Curated annotation (Swiss-Prot):
The keyword DNA damage applies. Gene3D superfamilies: Divalent-metal-dependent TIM barrel enzymes. GO terms for biological process: nucleotide-excision repair; pyrimidine dimer repair; response to UV. Keywords: DNA damage, DNA excision, DNA repair, Endonuclease, Hydrolase, Nuclease. SUPFAM superfamilies: Xylose isomerase-like. Component in a DNA repair pathway. Removal of UV LIGHT damaged nucleotides. Recognizes pyrimidine dimers and cleave a phosphodiester bond immediately 5' to the lesion. Its EC number is 3.-.-.-. This is UV DNA damage endonuclease. It is an enzyme of class 3 (hydrolase). It holds the Pfam family UvdE. GO terms for molecular function: endonuclease activity. It comes from Bacillus velezensis (strain DSM 23117 / BGSC 10A6 / LMG 26770 / FZB42).
Length: 320
């Protein structure tokens, strides 16, 4: 049974390598027409260059999972900008995708919490569709849309969860099927529990990303891990990818929803051990603040457990 690990966006061990450099709309509007285009191109070029640097880094360190930054392209979905970011950077996107395919990396995106399908406002749904399309277009430009996923949360409850869930199913029909096929859902830390999110996934045929920290912060009343985990595993069978779990640990007892800089191995061990009964390879995305540093420290700590063997920088063969 293999446990594989990855991290989010920015490799902390690389110098000045943020793939999420920004160009605010306020700054954009103060520029001349030619300066605006140059600024868009310059920031996007820097973010793609740093994304490529990070991909080389994960390959070199034997880290098989990576989540792209959602902020690679500035102002990509702003209604007053909406620019063609693929054509001028087709070579860069292709180079990134080529490395992903060559080294069989598992990649993903995670749009922010405002990309949701439970809102009663049509413009919110329209913006969600636009944002999902932006992420899909980047994957498509890389040539990896058929092997990557775009992960979001169910959304808000708006005072009535059942009505909101009904709207989710209706509003989701606005999303092109080719994008929905690459979509996953994750339980959140305040509103929709693991059981509620998993139920939506089962009904809609969407893979379920289980966040163990969120499960702890927003527990399910009528289900436990022995019920949730095998059902979660089953939701991934349709797209042929390994089940995926998000890992982080609370910053403190008084801030249980906040992510700590590193992952407390003792906090996550119960869920790692629970997977042994299903003998299934699992992919884990580390969501700690120290990103790759947290991943490497955690894998080092776990590899010291009797019966666990480290196969690569981010890969463990778990004890039988």
């Amino acid at each position: 049974m293999l446990f594989r690990f990855g991290f989010v966006a920015n490799a902390m061990c690389l110098w000045d390598a943020s793939p999420a450099k920004t160009l605010t709309y306020a700054r954009y509007t103060k520029l001349s027409r030619s300066e605006r285009k140059d600024a868009l191109l310059s920031v996007t070029k820097a973010n793609l260059t740093n994304t490529l640097r990070t991909i080389h880094y994960v390959v070199g360190h034997g880290i098989p999972l990576y989540r792209f930054s959602s902020s690679i392209v500035p102002l990509a979905t702003h209604p007053d900008v909406l620019w063609d970011f693929v054509t001028p950077f087709r070579q860069e996107f292709c180079e990134i995708g080529g490395l992903v395919r060559k080294y069989d990396l598992r990649t993903s995106f995670h749009p922010n919490q405002f990309t949701l399908f439970t809102s009663p406002k049509q413009e919110i749904t329209a913006n969600a569709v636009k944002d999902m399309a932006y992420h899909y277009d980047m994957l498509d430009a890389m040539g990896i849309a058929n092997r990557s996923v775009i992960n979001i949360h169910v959304g808000g409850a708006y005072g009535d969860k059942q009505s909101a869930l009904g709207r989710f199913r209706v509003n989701l029909k606005e999303l092109p099927d080719v994008i929905k096929q690459r979509m996953t859902l994750e339980n959140d830390d305040k509103t929709y529990t693991s059981e509620e999110t998993l139920s939506v996934c089962e009904q809609e045929g969407i893979p379920f990303v289980f966040d163990y920290h969120h499960f702890y912060a927003n527990p399910t009343d009528d289900a436990d891990l022995d019920d949730i985990l095998p059902r979660m595993i089953k939701t991934w069978q349709r797209i042929g990818l390994k089940p995926k779990v998000h890992l982080s640990s609370p910053k403190s007892e008084s801030a249980i929803r906040s992510h700590a800089d590193y992952v407390d191995a003792n906090f996550i061990l119960p869920v790692l051990e629970r997977f042994r009964q299903w003998d299934t390879d699992i992919d884990f995305m580390i969501e700690a603040k120290e990103k790759d540093r947290a991943l490497l420290r955690l894998v080092e700590e776990l590899s010291a457990i009797r019966g666990v063997k480290r196969l690569a920088g981010g890969v463990l063969k778990w004890k039988a």
